[in-house]
């Protein structure tokens, strides 16, 4: 069991239950999954960009990514419907907890000029999305081996439908939010 997961199950569940005023432990919000998505617009011209993105996402998450296809054709970008244009990974259980711990304690402190995560990135349904500008903040990525610095999105999906409860959960997990 991961340190962050152990802390959540032993200490944070009871704290959140009291803080949010729930009568049952089952009402306490929990992490459902983490989705890591990388759009590769350069894959229209050359498939090697997509292959390197798939490899980098595999190194970062420890799980094989799935290539995503374009839904619609856009003639100005020379994009056809069904063309491979990105990749994504859905993390659950142990890999989700280890990725979140790595994100909070290793990757985010390595971001240049990091002042905290924005509180505006909640979607109104209890999910939080982080935009990462460079994949080199993760220790698995060797700077000399990458062909291009590329960003990606990390969506943290919780079991609650309220942003305030999701914020309380993520704050309890020590997510570095901007000071209000």
Curated annotation (Swiss-Prot):
GO MF, one term, reads: rRNA binding
Q: Which UniProt keywords apply?
A: Ribonucleoprotein, Ribosomal protein, RNA-binding, rRNA-binding, tRNA-binding
Could you tell me which Pfam families the record lists for this protein? Answer: Ribosomal_L5, Ribosomal_L5_C
The answer to keyword RNA-binding applying to this record is: yes
The answer on whether this UniProt entry bears the keyword NADP reads no
* Gene Ontology biological-process annotations: translation
Q: Which GO terms describe its cellular component?
A: cytosolic large ribosomal subunit
Quote the SUPFAM superfamilies the UniProt record gives: RL5-like
Which cysteine pairs make disulfide bonds? none
Give the protein's function: This is one of the proteins that bind and probably mediate the attachment of the 5S RNA into the large ribosomal subunit, where it forms part of the central protuberance. In the 70S ribosome it contacts protein S13 of the 30S subunit (bridge B1b), connecting the 2 subunits; this bridge is implicated in subunit movement. Contacts the P site tRNA; the 5S rRNA and some of its associated proteins might help stabilize positioning of ribosome-bound tRNAs.
Query: Quaternary form?
Result: Part of the 50S ribosomal subunit; part of the 5S rRNA/L5/L18/L25 subcomplex. Contacts the 5S rRNA and the P site tRNA. Forms a bridge to the 30S subunit in the 70S ribosome.
Q: Which NCBIfam families match?
A: PRK00010.1
- Family that this chain belongs to: Belongs to the universal ribosomal protein uL5 family.
Q: What is the protein's given name?
A: Large ribosomal subunit protein uL5
Annotated organism of origin: Mycoplasma genitalium (strain ATCC 33530 / DSM 19775 / NCTC 10195 / G37)
